[in-house]
Structures are given as structure tokens and as C-alpha cells.
Amino acid sequence: MPKALTIQRSTVPSAERLNYTKRLKALRSHYSAANCRFWVFEELSLPGAFIEFTEADDEQTLSVAHANAPHKTLDPSRVYQEVDL
């Protein structure tokens, strides 16, 4: 079964950075417990511009993890599926 992935972009003002990183830590713990992988990257040339990736081994696992997340994803229905090359 192909892996499933969601992507979320966020722009965080410097005054909110500490709260945002706390939120990310809670999400990382949640997704890890839900058998998902969670990565966050910040754009080098634009501090505060983040992109979050959440991946699972299948779409069902990912959908359930998003539905139960402590902080909601903006559009959890936009799921990307791994392409077998």
C-alpha cells in the first residue's frame, strides 16, 4: 500500500514562535503515538515561514491521526499518495 502525506504551510510572527514550537512538539508526540511521521522545515530566506509534513503508511492511519490531533490541520482532506516509480 502506498504511503500517504499531508502538507501544511504556516507563517508565524516572531512574537508567536515560542507558542508555535510548543504546538509542534505536541503534534509530534501525537503523530508519533498514532504511527505517523511528522517533520517541520523553516524557509532559510524567510524566517517564520514553515512547512509541516505528516506521513503514514496508509491514508486511513493518516486520516484518523489528523481527526484526533490536538491542533487541527487546515485541510486534512488534501492527501498525497506516494507514486511507485
Predicted feature locations:
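Short S/T/G/P-rich N-terminal loop/turn motif that feeds into the first structured element of a domain
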Residues: 1-85
